[in-house]
Regions:
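Accessory DNA-binding and partner-docking regions appended to nucleic-acid-acting proteins
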Residues: 1-13, 366-367, 394-702
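Helicase motor core with emphasis on the C-terminal RecA-like subdomain
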Residues: 2-20, 24-28, 32-44, 48-54, ...
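Helix-turn-helix/winged-helix DNA-binding modules
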Residues: 25, 301, 379, 431-432, ...
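Eukaryotic partner-binding/assembly regions in large regulatory complexes
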Residues: 311-313, 377, 416, 476
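Short, charged low-complexity linear segments at domain edges
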Residues: 362-391
Length: 702
């Protein structure tokens, strides 16, 4: 490696942390990971969303000689990260199908001439000999494999092209690799290591705990009404994501919210590419927008002020649930993860598993994922304890989730379980019939419905033996028996059948403890909205904070980027509290790197002094969107020019001065990778490229 010594590299990494990214110290294991990769070692990194994974490859790319090549699964993710890096003065570019031939050639030329610090590629590009030959001709500092869980063949985000990434070490054996993901069980972790052929990699596993997120799971009654109550009472005016299982549910829910005064937009793969891009852009740029989406939405979205993530349908796995809820509260502020869950969710998921492709082993694997999700829903433990245990980590009760705030009562459900299981047995043995939960509950409660009379079920000996429980309670019994593996669902109609474990309950050899739903679901300790003062902001600083937010909003609109690409709320809060009176003092604020200090420092000082700031960015950077987000280098470096090709470079030869660096205190990296402006090409159908396999649509309803 072209460096003087390991200590020099470490020193330079700290300088990069501060000068480029505006942080004073690394967080958690960031420094250890960065030092290891700078030294040429392979690494597998498991770190939660908002934990600063991106810094772990961005800083080594700026310190090591050559260009860091980042393998990213989504085109939108590449665009977002590149745009935000340009704003920091990092020379970043990408190659994907949104570019025409001339644009691609420009980026390729910059790569070969060493005018890039980072190059983003989709994994599909590495199946193309032309791309491989390009990489052979350049100097590569490292390979970063982002969203590495996509290599897990039976995972929730599997991408087949990730399987081919094992060839990186074969073709470039001396180039270090770092694989990163925000969610992985021990099994997925092992699969990542094996499939990417990284046997000698060091493994870094951070805590998956997200203490600022409150986890709440409610019994599904009228889910859209329940959601509306949550938004009105606790998240008025907040940005959030609502996940639904189907496209039809997405459309209906978005329409319902709009009709009730909520700014909501749909997002699913059934919408055309332009509409999806426009809706995503509005979510990123406008305050208080709610996106209602299938799980196709969210990977790579770095909007820090998402205050809630709601699920109106049961997620397929705990891993998927964790990843989706992790999109809330990236800024560290209190946020809500809310899920409405009902019996029909289980029926639907079982039906999907039965009809899924793959062998019996695959279906058993999907069933085990669903069973773990059901167990999380029905637990009487702290949600956080149960969630972290799934990932092999230990934690004490959080005191903040619904089960901690309103501990559910438990009761002995053995007798009701025996009654329900006996009813199923009698229907099968005496009548040769199978029915779903609704009919079983009607029989138990002694309800002479038309269907009960039609099948003569009122003559069964078990008819009416469960009159002591209401229908909702019987549905709760069914849900919990399913979660405990004492009951199963089969077929298109969701009929209930016994399992091997059911016999022990019927014989009286096993007790069945159950949770009783609280009369009223617990709320957050204090309702939050974007209009409320942030929890860590002194009251006297609030007017200054709002003035800074207003300036940031105007500046972002002028430049055509999301507000948090200018500065995150956390940085504005620190500025409002510290009230710096000079650019030197402003430069010590977390999140204010040299490039942003040069561009925005005088304007911020004007706002703090109560003066009207001059329009546009300073230090020679134009205020129009074409050039605003693209300045490269330090305050003394020439302004950069951003091209539609997906790269930004300075006029100075060789490495950008960003490599001299600048990163630190709580270096989550969130401030570095906000989603940036969407290039015009991202809104259009990409041209066919000869010899290049199509990149998968970002928005598949998995």
């Amino acid at each position: 490696m072209d460096v003087d010594s390991a200590s020099d590299d470490v020193s330079e990494a700290v300088q990069v942390l501060r000068r480029v990214f505006g942080y004073d110290a690394f967080r958690g294991s960031q420094q250890e990971i960065i030092e290891h990769v700078i030294g040429g070692g392979d690494a597998v990194v498991l770190m939660p969303t908002g934990g600063g994974k991106s810094l772990c490859y961005q800083i080594p790319s700026l310190v090591r000689s050559g260009v860091g090549v980042v393998i990213s699964p989504l085109i939108a993710l590449m665009q977002d990260q590149v745009d935000a890096l340009r704003a920091l003065g990092v020379r970043a570019g990408f190659l994907n199908s949104t570019q025409d031939l001339e644009e691609r050639r420009l980026v390729e030329a910059e790569f070969l001439s060493g005018e890039l610090d980072l190059l983003y590629l989709a994994p599909e590009r590495l199946r193309v000999e032309q791309t491989l030959n390009l990489l052979d001709r350049g100097k590569i500092s490292l390979f970063a494999i982002d969203e590495a869980h996509c290599v897990a063949q039976w995972g929730h985000d599997f991408r087949p092209d990730y399987l081919a990434l094992s060839m990186l070490h074969e073709r470039w054996p001396d180039v270090p690799r770092i694989a990163l993901t925000a969610t992985a069980t021990d099994a997925t972790h092992t699969e990542i290591t094996s499939r990417l052929r990284m046997p000698d990699a060091r493994h870094f596993v951070a805590s998956f705990d997200r203490p600022n997120i409150q986890y709440r799971i409610a019994a599904k009654n009228e889910p859209k009404r329940q959601l509306l109550e949550l938004l009105r009472s606790e998240h008025a005016g907040d940005a959030g994501i609502v996940y639904c299982l189907s496209r039809a549910s997405v459309e209906k829910t978005a329409q319902f919210l709009v009709q009730n005064g909520i700014d909501a937009l749909p997002y699913h793969a059934g919408l055309d590419a332009r509409t999806r891009a426009e809706n995503q852009s509005r979510f990123l740029r406008e305050d208080g927008m709610v996106v209602v989406a299938t799980i196709a939405f969210g990977m790579g979205i770095d909007k820090p002020d998402v205050r809630f993530v709601a699920h109106l349908d049961l997620p397929k796995s705990v891993e998927g649930y964790y990843q989706e809820t992790g999109r809330a509260g990236r800024d560290g502020q209190p946020s809500t993860a809310w899920l409405a869950y009902g019996l029909q969710d289980v029926v639907q998921q079982r039906k999907m598993i039965d009809g899924s492709e793959g062998d019996d082993a695959h279906r058993r694997r999907l069933s085990s994922h669903l069973d773990a999700m059901l167990a999380l829903c029905e637990t009487v433990q702290c949600r956080r304890v149960r969630l972290l245990a799934y990932f092999g980590q230990q934690s004490g009760p959080c005191g903040n989730c619904d089960t901690c705030l309103a501990p559910p009562q438990t009761w002995d459900g053995t007798v009701p379980a025996q009654k329900l299981l006996s009813t199923i047995v009698r229907l099968q043995r005496e009548r040769g019939q199978k029915f779903g939960a609704g009919q079983i509950a009607d029989i138990l409660m002694g309800k002479k419905t038309a269907k009960v009379i039609q099948f003569d079920h009122d003559s069964l000996s078990v008819f009416g033996i469960g009159e002591d429980l209401r229908e909702a309670e019987w549905r709760g019994v069914v849900r919990q028996l399913l979660a405990q593996g004492l009951l199963a669902v089969e077929g298109d109609y969701g009929t209930l059948v016994l399992t091997e474990a059911s016999a022990e309950v019927l014989r009286g050899g096993r007790e069945v403890p159950m949770r009783r739903e609280p009369e009223k679901a617990p709320r957050a300790a204090k309702a939050k909205s974007r209009r409320a003062a942030p929890v860590d902001l002194p009251e006297e600083a609030l007017p200054v904070f709002e003035s800074l937010r207003a300036w940031r909003g105007r500046t972002a609109k002028e430049q055509g980027v999301p507000a948090y690409v200018i500065f995150h709320d956390a940085t504005l809060r620190e500025i409002a509290t510290a009230r710096p009176s000079s650019t030197a003092e402003l430069g010590t604020v977390t999140g204010v790197g040299e490039n942003k200090l040069a561009k925005y420092g005088p304007q911020i000082l004007d706002v703090l002094a109560g003066r009207e700031p001059d329009g546009g960015a300073t230090d020679g950077t134009a205020s129009d969107p074409a050039s605003a987000g693209s300045a490269a280098g330090s305050a003394s470096a020439p302004a950069a020019s951003a091209s539609a090709s997906g790269s930004a470079s300075t006029s100075a030869p060789g490495r950008s001065s960003a490599r001299a660096g600048r990163p630190g205190t709580g270096a989550s990296g969130a401030g570095a990778f906000g989603a940036g402006a969407f290039g015009a090409g991202a809104l259009e159908e990409p041209p066919e490229e000869e010899g290049v396999p199509p990149e998968p649509e970002d928005d598949i309803d998995w």
